[in-house]
Amino acid sequence: LCDRRQRQMCIRDRAKTPSLYNVIYDGERIPLLLAGGDRLTLGSVGSVIRNYTVEGSSESELLRQFYQAFVTGAQQLENMGTEFARKLTDEERKSLIKEYTAEYYRIRREQLRFIIEHKASLAAVYALYQRLPGDTYLFNGDSDVVYYRTVAEALQESYPESPYLQSLQAEIARMDARISLTSQITEARHPDLELTDIYGKK
């Protein structure tokens, strides 16, 4: 802390490209993307996650836009999930399932929209790796590599020296290798067969 009374914090890292930092306040985590020279101001009224504001860092502001919406949506799903523990009528259960499903897919659509619209930002990299409870993949398993590659190609122009770009490219290489291996295994299970026609000719 530079000044405990004023709640000012100084980070001595002078990285040219933004790095991810987490500020923990009142048990809640606020992710920030900060580069050398940034002078950031954080503010909040009431619930920290729902209401915090960011000034002085464009990447942190973009990250706030994604993070607040994503976390709020995930909390909404969690609240609806607890409702299933209550004794519900068939009609109430069907209604809750419909509401839960609609919210789930809304969050997923907004996540993908953010990634595509802000593909040249490091906030998009953060969004790529966020998952709702129970989810393994971003969207649909092997097809996820399309989104990773889209962001990586954009970052080559905006942040070519970022270590997050290198990590992203390594992840894409692993995904490509897995897809290739899966394809080879599938082909091995279904060998080409040469069959004769009704006249006994191939």
Regions found by a protein language model. Name each.
Residues 1-7, 11:
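Single conserved hydrophobic/aromatic residue that forms the stacking wall/gate
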